[in-house]
């Protein structure tokens, strides 16, 4: 809600849309040498109740500092450094294909989640009925 208030152009351009932060998120702990090394984007086409098909934005919260860790964005040729408390938000689609950078000496812990188009009430109702 606050995001839409802070970015009124979204409602102006897409008045039929609303956004909600998906209450389901992932907490991931990678041992040294582990990580999500495969290039990917965060949109989904699944029909599972816990995975709405309308992911708009993705977010990553870095839970610790990791030297040379972080997230690499392919098309942007950009590496976001993993710093404790840093939150990054980016488009979930193919414009922001990304992967985790692996550190062979340190543990990396992140939380990841999504901001979806639609209404939270409808999503919760769908979860309750599945």
Model feature map: region roles:
Residues 1-87, 95-130:
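Fe(II)/2-oxoglutarate oxygenase catalytic core
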């Amino acid at each position: 809600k606050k995001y839409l208030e802070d970015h009124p152009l979204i409602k102006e351009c897409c008045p039929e849309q609303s956004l909600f932060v998906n209450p389901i998120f992932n907490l991931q702990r990678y041992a040294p040498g582990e990580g999500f090394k495969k290039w990917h984007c965060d949109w989904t086409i699944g029909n599972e109740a816990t995975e709405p098909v309308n992911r708009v934005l993705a977010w990553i919260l870095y839970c610790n500092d990791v030297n040379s860790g972080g997230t690499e964005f392919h098309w942007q040729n950009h590496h976001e450094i993993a710093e404790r408390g840093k939150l990054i938000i980016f488009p979930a689609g193919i414009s922001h294909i990304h992967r985790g950078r692996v550190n062979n000496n340190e543990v990396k812990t992140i939380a990841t989640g999504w901001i979806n188009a639609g209404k939270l009430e409808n999503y919760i109702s769908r979860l309750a009925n599945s």
